[in-house]
Amino acid sequence: MNRTVAIVVFPGVQALDVSGPMDVFAEANRFLAPEDHYRLDVIGVERGSMACSNGLTLSAHRHFSEASQVYDLLLVAGGPQLPFLDFGSTFDAWLREACGRARRFGSICNGAFMLARAGLLDGRTVTTHWNDAEALAQLCSSSRVEADRLYVEDGQLYTSAGVTAGIDLSLYLLARDYGAEVALSVAKRLVVFTQRSGGQSQFSPFLTPHAEPTSAVAMVQLYVLANLTGDLTIADLANAANMSARNFSRVFAREGAAPVSKKLLS
C-alpha cells in the first residue's frame, strides 16, 4: 500500500530541510514495488511560489487549506527566521488537526517552533537545531528539549536536529517502514551514513579544533581525515607533518598530550 509523506514549507524555508527528507523517500521508490511507493506532497503556508533562505524557489503542490487528507507522515521544515515567525491562528488550527489525523508527524531542524506554536509539543521530549534549543525551551517550557540529539521519537512525534539531521530521521523512518536493507540502499545512493543513531551528538568531533591550525597535530589530523580508508603508519603520518618518525612522535605527544594512536581517535 502506498504511503503518503507531506512536508510543510513557507517563505524563507531552509531548502535542505525540504530536499533532504524528500530525496530519501523519493530514492526509496527505486527499491520498492509500485504498490509500496511513497507519494510526496508539499504543502504551502502561502499560495504560489516561495523563496527559500538560499534563494531557490519552491512551489507547493497545495495550500494548507486544501490539505485535508490523512498523511502517513507529516513533517514541517525549518528556516533561519522561523523562530521569529507566526503564521496565525488559522494555520495553527489546521496544523493541529492535520497532525492529529496523521499516523506520524514531526519537524526538521527548527521546524519544531511551528509545532510548538500550535501546541503540539506540550509535555513532549523533542530536539531541534542546537543553536535554537534554548529559545525553544523558553517558548515551550513544558517540553523537554534535548539539545544534543540527532533526532528524538516520542510516541507519534518525531523531531530532528539541524538541517542534515532530517536525512538521518528520514532514513530511520524508512527503515521502520521497509527495513534496514532498503534504508542502506538509499543511504548508498545519497552517499550518506546509515545510520547515525538518534542519540548521537549533533556536534561532530571533526568540527572541533583540537590543535593550532598550523601545528603538526592539525596537519596530521587533516591528513588522516583525507585518508580514512588507508592503512596509515607512523612513517606516513610523520611524512605528512614533514618530520622524521622519531621527532614526529615526540612533537605529537608534546602538542597532543597523548600518544599518537589515542590522539588520532579523539
How should these model regions be labeled?
Residues P21, F91, G111, D132-A135, ...:
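Internal, well-ordered alpha-helical segments in soluble enzyme and binding-protein domains
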Residues A33-L40, R144, Y178-S185:
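A short alpha-helix-loop-beta-strand transition element characteristic
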Residues R149-R189:
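Conserved anion/nucleotide-ligand pocket segment
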Residues D177-L222, G230:
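Accessory alpha-helical/coil subdomains and C-terminal extensions
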